[in-house]
Amino acid sequence: MLYYILRYINELYSLPGMGVIEYLTFRASAAAITALLIIIFAGQRFIRFLKSKFVEPIKEEAPPEHRKKKDVPTMGGLMIIFAIEVSAFLWAKIDDPHVWLIMLAVFWMGLIGFIDDYQKVVLKVKGGLAGHYKLIGQVTLGLVIGFYTWNDPVFSVLLSDTTVPFFKKLSVDYGIFYIPVVIFIITAVSNAVNLTDGLDGLAAGNAAIVTFALGVFAYLCGNAVYSGYLSIPFISGAGEVAVVSMAIVMACVGFLWFNSSPAEVFMGDTGSLSLGSAIAVIALMIKQELLLPVLAGVFFVETLSVSMQVAWFKISKKLYGEGRRIFLMAPLHHHFQLKGWAEQKIVIRFWIISILLFLTSLMTLKLR
């Protein structure tokens, strides 16, 4: 909204320096700063409110170290969502479909996560929202995103094609499977971030790194010169994705101000599902979803560890009459906790891995 107001003022009065509002880098930086300041200045008061109403009980099967977190409030994802939506509304071109589709994804999956958290914390429903209802929410979002991008002329330029990392001129056409692929990616990534949200700062830090990388890709895809030089598809309007991406990055960083160990607040499913859906939608819009197993490798491995644990437990029960485990506990971060690793060490090492994967993803721009 500020973009349109300042642009209108500039057209009327031609004030010196006002033309900077047209620069993506300026608006991306402004959105990032706005998101960060919203959380830092409103965070403490909001945490006090959450603590009076929304303290989630610690699961019995959780590692012993988690017992000391019994009084930490959840639903901190509401702060993240508010900061993202306000920052994007102020600094991005909100009439651009890239922008409002990301904002829709953040809001919708945040709502699903909120219902889940509310049932667990307030209504004391064990396990929260039933898994099939979450799945319905994810599929609904996937259908909306899929059908809209398939039919809207802004997106239909590339139709259902997507790029393949490490290959210069190779692309994949999903064809009639485009919408199922969209649904799968949104569901998989939102669940992956949700599974990773188990240690102080783990999900927020990794989400910030992954989204920053996607923001860089969005900026390059939205620039005809850079995209041509790097042999990646030029996507008109993708630059606005970079503005929203930076808002998400700094909303996560601002949240880390309170969520780093020892955490004062947890994001809950409210935050993890919304961040995961945002990452998925951004990747889909800039045709980098096939890069996610590399870029979002930490989320991918965390999810894989759960799948392997469950599968082997069921298989071994049939083979040996008792369920056996590959890991001490899944997701993987809990395995390392039970092996004696300090929580902060696990989180920082996972951040380092995400940074390495981010750099590897950037290398794919030239390794083609």
UniProtKB/Swiss-Prot annotation:
<keyword id="KW-0460">Magnesium</keyword>
<dbReference type="Pfam" id="PF00953">
    <property type="entry name" value="Glycos_transf_4"/>
</dbReference>
<keyword id="KW-1003">Cell membrane</keyword>
<dbReference type="InterPro" id="IPR018480">
    <property type="entry name" value="PNAcMuramoyl-5peptid_Trfase_CS"/>
</dbReference>
<dbReference type="InterPro" id="IPR003524">
    <property type="entry name" value="PNAcMuramoyl-5peptid_Trfase"/>
</dbReference>
<keyword id="KW-0961">Cell wall biogenesis/degradation</keyword>
<feature type="transmembrane region" description="Helical">
    <location>
        <begin position="98"/>
        <end position="118"/>
    </location>
</feature>
<keyword id="KW-0133">Cell shape</keyword>
<comment type="function">
    <text>Catalyzes the initial step of the lipid cycle reactions in the biosynthesis of the cell wall peptidoglycan: transfers peptidoglycan precursor phospho-MurNAc-pentapeptide from UDP-MurNAc-pentapeptide onto the lipid carrier undecaprenyl phosphate, yielding undecaprenyl-pyrophosphoryl-MurNAc-pentapeptide, known as lipid I.</text>
</comment>
<keyword id="KW-0808">Transferase</keyword>
<dbReference type="GO" id="GO:0051992">
    <property type="term" value="F:UDP-N-acetylmuramoyl-L-alanyl-D-glutamyl-meso-2,6-diaminopimelyl-D-alanyl-D-alanine:undecaprenyl-phosphate transferase activity"/>
</dbReference>
<feature type="transmembrane region" description="Helical">
    <location>
        <begin position="170"/>
        <end position="190"/>
    </location>
</feature>
<keyword id="KW-0472">Membrane</keyword>
<keyword id="KW-0131">Cell cycle</keyword>
<feature type="transmembrane region" description="Helical">
    <location>
        <begin position="72"/>
        <end position="92"/>
    </location>
</feature>
<feature type="transmembrane region" description="Helical">
    <location>
        <begin position="139"/>
        <end position="159"/>
    </location>
</feature>
<comment type="pathway">
    <text>Cell wall biogenesis; peptidoglycan biosynthesis.</text>
</comment>
<feature type="transmembrane region" description="Helical">
    <location>
        <begin position="238"/>
        <end position="258"/>
    </location>
</feature>
<dbReference type="GO" id="GO:0051301">
    <property type="term" value="P:cell division"/>
</dbReference>
<dbReference type="GO" id="GO:0008360">
    <property type="term" value="P:regulation of cell shape"/>
</dbReference>
<keyword id="KW-0573">Peptidoglycan synthesis</keyword>
<keyword id="KW-0132">Cell division</keyword>
<dbReference type="GO" id="GO:0009252">
    <property type="term" value="P:peptidoglycan biosynthetic process"/>
</dbReference>
<feature type="transmembrane region" description="Helical">
    <location>
        <begin position="23"/>
        <end position="43"/>
    </location>
</feature>
<feature type="transmembrane region" description="Helical">
    <location>
        <begin position="201"/>
        <end position="221"/>
    </location>
</feature>
<comment type="similarity">
    <text>Belongs to the glycosyltransferase 4 family. MraY subfamily.</text>
</comment>
<keyword id="KW-0812">Transmembrane</keyword>
<keyword id="KW-1133">Transmembrane helix</keyword>
<dbReference type="GO" id="GO:0046872">
    <property type="term" value="F:metal ion binding"/>
</dbReference>
<dbReference type="GO" id="GO:0008963">
    <property type="term" value="F:phospho-N-acetylmuramoyl-pentapeptide-transferase activity"/>
</dbReference>
<keyword id="KW-0997">Cell inner membrane</keyword>
<dbReference type="GO" id="GO:0071555">
    <property type="term" value="P:cell wall organization"/>
</dbReference>
<feature type="transmembrane region" description="Helical">
    <location>
        <begin position="345"/>
        <end position="365"/>
    </location>
</feature>
<keyword id="KW-0479">Metal-binding</keyword>
<dbReference type="InterPro" id="IPR000715">
    <property type="entry name" value="Glycosyl_transferase_4"/>
</dbReference>
<dbReference type="GO" id="GO:0005886">
    <property type="term" value="C:plasma membrane"/>
</dbReference>
<feature type="transmembrane region" description="Helical">
    <location>
        <begin position="281"/>
        <end position="301"/>
    </location>
</feature>
<protein>
    <recommendedName>
        <fullName>Phospho-N-acetylmuramoyl-pentapeptide-transferase</fullName>
        <ecNumber>2.7.8.13</ecNumber>
    </recommendedName>
</protein>
